[in-house]
């Protein structure tokens, strides 16, 4: 009887593991080619995960809190170049490739311009391995890299000829237990 009670108590305390889906375009994108959030959103829904990445609870919480603290902006250009789509439970957003501008999905499905903290943008790009798909000469142009530095685990993904370069990546970010 005692064992049954323990099993029941443990099952009542089980909780859903926190996770984020991060989908991004690999490498540099031509500035004249605009990718809208709705496009990233629809592609993300059709492909499988490439990897599951585990991060420590502190980094995960910083990312989660930063996503919740996104600030709407009024004067933002209509054309944008989103390179990353993030699903954090009930919140979806797209992130610009060169700075901290983002677009948050509203109830009607429209994306509205916002700003995410530099730290959160940096953590999203770093922990999802987005930076690994940028050559060093492009990496150093990133606003967050200039502020926080190149991540200690940065490894530029070199593609050998004639292998086709990876175009997109979808990762699941989870808390390391």
Task: Name every feature range the model reports, one short phrase each.
Residues 13-177:
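Function-determining sites in protein domains
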Residues 1-5:
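Sec-dependent signal peptide recognition
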Residues 9-11:
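C-terminal motif of bacterial Sec signal peptides marking the signal peptidase cleavage site
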